[in-house]
């Protein structure tokens, strides 16, 4: 059983590397995101935590208001998907993020988790 679990974990890591994606979860109480190694490396972070404010400021300015408004209007749904440009360690990149909302805890905080995936720049319409 333990051998199969290790094999599954290795396969999952290989697949996420191939897909250029990593996981994250929110710490609403402390206003931070906790990020996987992939996201830490992609964004050039110094630790596995980034404040909501710092992450928001990395999003290209012409997308910030739209994303904030969509997030607020969709926060009562179970999942939410978005694509946006963000400042990474090697310049601006495009990412796709899928979010899943958790039920509020005893203190009323509603943490979220999801994944962030590097994508080629979308075609201009």
For each predicted feature, which ranges?
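PAS-family sensory domains
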Residues: 26, 85-93, 103-104
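PAS/Per-ARNT-Sim sensory domains
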Residues: 50-72
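PAS-associated C-terminal cap
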Residues: 1-10, 117-125
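PAS-family sensory domain signal
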Residues: 4-56, 94-100
